From Swiss-Prot:
The keyword Ribosomal protein applies. The gene is rpsJ. This is Small ribosomal subunit protein uS10. PANTHER family: 30S RIBOSOMAL PROTEIN S10 FAMILY MEMBER (PTHR11700). GO terms for molecular function: structural constituent of ribosome; tRNA binding. Part of the 30S ribosomal subunit. Signal peptide: none annotated. The lineage of its organism: Bacteria, Pseudomonadati, Pseudomonadota, Gammaproteobacteria, Cellvibrionales.
Length: 103
């Protein structure tokens, strides 16, 4: 796996969950002898929704909701075979989306 790079993108609604998962990946990669760059926090996407409270009248009565999508980026430089095996066996928390690309 010479001159390889593994890029890992993580997405989650809960920032504590994504930070814990990122820390677990970093510890696993370092334990197997790989060099890690990151975690790099990417911009948080904020989606806002405005909903009318009443079914008929009172246009002024509204509720506002927000969903925040937190993102992190990790680069594992020069991974070993042990690193790839350990990352495949790693069990992350539910609610964290993981995208892995080889470059």
């Amino acid at each position: 796996m010479q001159n390889q790079r593994i890029r890992i993108r993580l997405k989650a609604f809960d920032h504590k969950l994504i930070d814990a998962s990122t820390q677990e990946i970093v510890e696993t990669a370092k334990r197997t002898g790989a060099q890690v760059r990151g975690p790099i926090p990417l911009p948080t996407r904020k989606e806002r929704f405005t909903v009318l409270i009443s079914p008929h009248v009172n246009k002024d009565a509204r509720d506002q909701y927000e969903i925040r999508t937190h993102k992190r980026l990790l680069d594992i430089v020069e991974p070993t075979e042990k690193t790839v095996d350990a990352l495949m066996k790693l069990d992350l928390a539910a609610g964290v989306e993981v995208q892995i690309s080889l470059g």
